[in-house]
Curated annotation (Swiss-Prot):
Record protein name field: tRNA U34 carboxymethyltransferase
Pfam families on file: Methyltransf_9
UniProt: carboxy-S-adenosyl-L-methionine binding residues: K91, W105, K110, G130, D152, P153, T154, I181, E182, M196, Y200, R315
Reactions this protein catalyses: carboxy-S-adenosyl-L-methionine + 5-hydroxyuridine(34) in tRNA = 5-carboxymethoxyuridine(34) in tRNA + S-adenosyl-L-homocysteine + H(+)
Subunit composition and interactions: Homotetramer.
Protein family: Belongs to the class I-like SAM-binding methyltransferase superfamily. CmoB family.
Chain's role: Catalyzes carboxymethyl transfer from carboxy-S-adenosyl-L-methionine (Cx-SAM) to 5-hydroxyuridine (ho5U) to form 5-carboxymethoxyuridine (cmo5U) at position 34 in tRNAs.
Length: 323
């Protein structure tokens, strides 16, 4: 059973303590009524992983853990088998004692695009909304963050995160809470809030921006990464049934329109710091994610378009401040 007691004890002593007014009851309800049918199988994989304290831990340049002496072939095989029980692995990569988890996404590439534009993360308390397996949280810790809290309701991601955490020596500087942002009170407690790859899944994108703002301290920084299309400040794509085979894509604005949305929600110092086309080198099928990926979602005769005829995925990073 995944235990949240360490997180409760941690935030009881800091400026997130008011979250304890609602969080334990929400988690208890989740444990009692909302667990996925495969959750026990996934959590067993975490439980059966060996307890290892890394001799060398690199979170600054990658997520890599190594032992002082090489593990035996049997130990490596055990780790690999248990981690494969948690497939598909979408966000990474991870290198853990000789087991290299080549995830669908090269999330390290996204981090390399984002990092140069951030305020110094040293000592910061960070919220990562829609954090997936938690890859970027570990990179935030590597960049000096004091605490990284991720929220994501996908329970497989929780188990992937806990598996990686265990292999990183049960590191308590990052925590994943299996809730969506709409389940959080207005904590107003995080120095930096990340929302990467979430906005286009929201039926009400402006409401999402308000929710992000409600989590920030005054003068806190928002890092927003999402799908965009080319166009002026009035350009927004509203896809039909699917976009790149995804059913739950609602609004894809231009970067300039998104800048206006942020302004409308009261953010200031808004910057578009990166815009790039998603390539099939950055998102692709691997032996750790064997189902369809980006190449299957693009027009085989014109990769500048999705199979539905929309512009192929392009992503922008915007940074803004809550006054």
């Amino acid at each position: 059973m995944i235990d949240f007691g360490n997180f409760y004890s941690l935030i009881a002593k800091n400026h997130l303590s008011h979250w304890l007014e609602t969080l334990p009851a929400q988690i208890a309800n989740w444990q009692r009524e909302q667990q996925h049918g495969l959750f026990k199988q996934w959590s067993n994989a975490v439980e059966f992983l060996p307890e290892i304290k890394p001799y060398r831990l690199d979170l600054l340049h990658s997520v890599t853990a190594e032992s002082e002496e090489p593990l035996s072939t049997g130990q490596i095989k055990r780790i690999e088998t248990l981690m494969r029980n948690l497939m598909p692995w979408r966000k990474g990569p991870f290198s853990l004692y000789g087991v290299n988890i080549d995830t669908e996404w090269r999330s390290d590439w996204k981090w390399d695009r984002v990092l140069p534009h951030l305020s110094d993360l040293t000592g910061r308390t960070i919220l990562d909304v829609g954090c997936g397996s938690g890859y970027h949280m570990w990179r935030m810790i590597g960049a000096g963050a004091h605490l990284a809290v991720g929220i994501d309701p996908t329970q497989l991601f929780l188990c992937q995160f806990e598996a990686v955490r265990k292999l990183l020596g049960n590191d308590q500087r990052a925590h994943l809470i299996p809730l969506g942002i709409e389940q959080l009170p207005a904590l107003k407690a995080f120095d930096t809030v990340f929302s990467m790859g979430v906005l286009y899944h929201r039926r009400s994108p402006l409401e999402h921006l308000w929710q992000l703002k409600d989590q920030l301290v005054n003068e806190g920084e928002l890092v927003l990464e999402t799908l965009v299309i080319d166009g002026d400040e009035n350009t927004v794509l509203v896809p039909g049934d699917r976009y790149a085979q995804m059913r739950n894509v609602y609004f894809i604005p231009s970067a300039l329109a998104l800048k206006n949305w942020l302004k409308k929600c009261g953010f200031v110092d808004i910057r578009i710091v990166d815009v790039c086309v998603t390539t099939t080198e950055e998102q692709r099928r691997t032996e750790w994610m064997v189902t369809e990926s980006l190449s299957d979602f693009l027009d085989p005769h014109d990769p500048s378009k999705t199979v539905e005829g929309y512009p192929a995925p392009k992503r922008a990073v915007l940074i803004a401040r809550k006054p």
